Amino acid sequence: MGGAALVMAALREPELFRALVLYEPIIFPPQVRVGITNTGVPSPLANGARRRRSTFASFDEAISNYSSKPPLNVMRSDALRAYVMHGFRAQHDGISIKCSPEHEARTYEMGAIHETWNDLPKLRVPVWLVSGEVIPHTPGAIAALIANEVSGSTLVQWNDLGHFGPMQDPQRFAQLIAQVDAATQ
């Protein structure tokens, strides 16, 4: 959801940005937004967040847990370690996640409501839209649609990565950012 937030910021204050590199931003076209918000069916992502385990005995236990099952098991080990070390706080009886499950669930529920899609043609900052494998009904499937709405944008498709692509292959993502930085100096 950081990509959507950056787009919103660039629409308001474009002078703050030389370029945007966005990985599967959560910006839905109107027909998808309506389908998501009017179904009356609870979001599976929100429900999953509410059920997510929020405490562990130790950082190592959390890393072991996340590395053994989807979706975080695809992350490179150093990225997963950083995710846990910075996403949890120590407490007297172990560690607890910094972002409460309810807050995360609300973020998923609200992510489909913003109307940033309608303003994409107004974006005047160079944009690189990066997507992992295109799977129906995922943010990867929408990246090309977003690119079509942003004049002059560049679509980068990495079919060997999923939605956690920057954490699966941080080096490749860093190289792209360096290329964009050099191209927009």
How should these model regions be labeled?
Residues 1-35:
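Conserved hydrolase catalytic core segment
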Residues 173, 177, 181:
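Hydrophobic "lid"/C-terminal helical patch
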Residues 77-78, 87-148, 154-157:
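Conserved serine/cysteine hydrolase catalytic core
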Residues 17-18, 150-153, 161:
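Core-facing hydrophobic residues within beta-strands of well-ordered domains
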